[in-house]
């Protein structure tokens, strides 16, 4: 097995280096900035080492086997119907926006990107995994590019909508990536970011046992507050924020709704399950039983 090469970083939100240890998980340390409250992995594996992890077949077809470097997905292709549902829910608040050019950052194998395309958007995707983007291109016929967002020569002021779904926590430098995206977006364009919220009620209760402390895959553990501050600093205005709890927190099923979602789609129960899921999310919001946040913001 490849030896893990660790690196120390400063806070991505405020640049401070003063932290306190929040959790120790296996060989990895999660810290909290004493200045702004951002939670992140420090030290962490070198980003190039993690890129090799994401580039592997085993990451997307791990069979549920966890390694020192990643949790992975038992079979990513079985999430297609669920990711279509996620895409539809994500677009509900912006359904009045006329479809234009869309960029999905962290598009993976392209299932959500495919759904965005079906909804009328001129869709582009980017992901650091060549394995995933090759699938998106060859199997789904999508415009999927391999690499980090700052490596592409998209024109400035080009995109009408940018989506970042459960990806920002993997980014080595979220600030730099968001600054790049800000340049690529038209004035008034919308960015949608969904990520786990470490300041939600469920993470506070479960602490180091919280299901979404995936280390070392997750470099950052944003809260709704730290993510909003980062977006505002870069030049976005917050227009909407929704918080909810994922079923993974309730079932103890750590990486993405494995048990209930599999049953729902295998037995074609979507017509029954989707209203129930929406009700579950509404109750979770009312009780503040949250561990995931979605922020809608526009470029100033």
Predicted regions: what is each one?
Residues 172-176, 203:
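Short N-terminal helix/helix-N-cap motif within the alpha/beta-hydrolase-1
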